Amino acid sequence: MAAKEVKFGDSARQRMLAGVNILADAVKATLGPKGRNVVLEKSFGAPTITKDGVSVAKEISLKDKFENMGAQMVKEVASKASDDAGDGTTTATVLAQAIVNEGLKSVAAGMNPMDLKRGIDKAIAEAVKHVQSIAVPCADSKSISQVGTISANSDSSIGNLIAEAMEKVGKEGVITVEEGTSLDNELDVVEGMQFDRGYLSPYFINNQDNMSVEHDNPFILLVDKKISNIRELLPVLEGVAKSGKPLVIVAEDVEGEALATLVVNNIRGIVKVAAVKAPGFGDRRKAMLQDIAVLTGGTVISEEVGLDLESATLEHLGTAKRVTMNKDNTTIVDGAGKAEEIKTRVQQIRVQIEETSSDYDREKLQERVAKLAGGVAVIKVGAATEVEMKEKKARVEDALHATRAAVEEGVVPGGGTALIRAVAAIADLKGDNEDQNAGIGIARRAMESPLRQIVANAGEEPSVVADSVKKGSGNFGYNAATGVYGDMIEMGILDPAKVTRTALQAAGSIAGLMITTEAMVADLPEDKPAAAPDMGGMGGMGGMM
């Protein structure tokens, strides 16, 4: 086992803090409507230019192991915010940095780290409650468009496009983002279905850029049982191989020898193939397989209807224009099913919705209707260069996550205003002792930091603006894009409540852990032995060359 270097107490925390600040300073430059860009070097090709906090955070890795641990912990804050709400990564990072900096000062002054953490946790919990209480529902196209615009760094064309997409496929529908071929953004609405199962083996991946499986015009085999014996699959595989088309298998499971053979065939290019587990469980799985069959014009191979795999032919297979899979989801676009049959199927499910008494069943049935009837909206991002395309695509994806979050939990006034109001709401909060009160104070001061950073990035004086916003009430805030004070919701500056809530929780959770750190352990750098010197020419051996 390699030797370790251990640091204790203040010296450990100071090194960790240095790493936190390096990463957070790079990320927070992107915050707000006047946030700056960050340029990321790529191992090949042009550098990437981004204003997306989590993209910047993911690129940073520091040479000093102790500083790097601090940076990685803040990176975790950004990733957590991104995973849970899809946005708010920069806000979460700014909050975490503020809490850690203030918290470590208090620890150095002799306060009890555990009480500080309890105070911070208490303040964050109350602030989250306040944010949820002031949220207003986000139902109409206008507010959806405003949320999308803010999240896409004040690009209204993106906000409008997302609002239009949501209008067309409904809030339950599926919206995906692709790279377009023209200079302008385009919106395509395609009949399709998405379900929450990903590829069964990473060896099926054929698009390395986004680690996904993409097949055009594939056959789709639907099986209502586990496939473990490759002999059962051979007749279908041979038929598909002759046709030259890809094959997508949707089954209860594909395992053992069958999965191994499919992987080998795929790698060798004999048959392009991908397998995915069928969505749902039990009777719901059977119903969803039947939905996919109706959508793709195929037949579910099930012993219940007297069909077995060995007797399956190409007639039993469904087809679709495109099937894409990542590790979590599969999307079937433009299935070859008859419109009349799809309509009948939707009607059947609607009858079940009316008859069911269980809320859970109703919700699942509504999801199935959305998948059959809602279709898939595809936003095609247009740009002049590849560098701009990648940056713009990342912004569209961010904006899409933000609008989904807004529809889910409502919106609050943006521009850091909601957090300033939360500070006022927890003004009377008290802990069990003085150190807990200090923790509450740390969290309250940290909640001002997103507004201050937005203002600083816009080139104004943070203290003056923060003071003016604090004196106001309700939705009164500062529009950094125009330099005007006013009602943030009327000005269309909205943040999804879920994004603000997640940023607070992620920052509080990880910053609390960092404040209570007492020791850090890292590998010692290995002293590599110096290379042996070259052997000089050895006299008398010339004849050997």
From Swiss-Prot:
UniProt-annotated binding residues for ATP: 30-33, 51, 87-91, 415, 479-481, 495
Name assigned to this protein: Chaperonin GroEL
Catalytic reaction equation(s): ATP + H2O + a folded polypeptide = ADP + phosphate + an unfolded polypeptide
One cellular-component annotation, GO: cytoplasm
SUPFAM superfamilies tied to this protein: GroEL apical domain-like, GroEL equatorial domain-like, GroEL-intermediate domain like
NCBIfam families tied to this protein: GroEL (TIGR02348), PRK00013.1 (NF000592), PRK12849.1 (NF009487), PRK12850.1 (NF009488), PRK12851.1 (NF009489)
Compartments (UniProt record): Cytoplasm
Family (UniProt): Belongs to the chaperonin (HSP60) family.
Pfam families for this protein: Cpn60_TCP1
GO BP: protein refolding
EC numbers on record: 5.6.1.7
First-tier enzyme category under EC: isomerase
One example GO MF annotation: ATP binding
UniProt keyword terms in alphabetical order: ATP-binding, Chaperone, Cytoplasm, Isomerase, Nucleotide-binding
Superkingdom: Bacteria
Subunit structure and binding partners: Forms a cylinder of 14 subunits composed of two heptameric rings stacked back-to-back. Interacts with the co-chaperonin GroES.
Source organism per UniProt: Cellvibrio japonicus (strain Ueda107)
Protein's job: Together with its co-chaperonin GroES, plays an essential role in assisting protein folding. The GroEL-GroES system forms a nano-cage that allows encapsulation of the non-native substrate proteins and provides a physical environment optimized to promote and accelerate protein folding.
InterPro entries: Chaperonin_Cpn60_CS, Cpn60/GroEL, Cpn60/GroEL/TCP-1, GroEL-like_apical_dom_sf, GROEL-like_equatorial_sf, TCP-1-like_intermed_sf
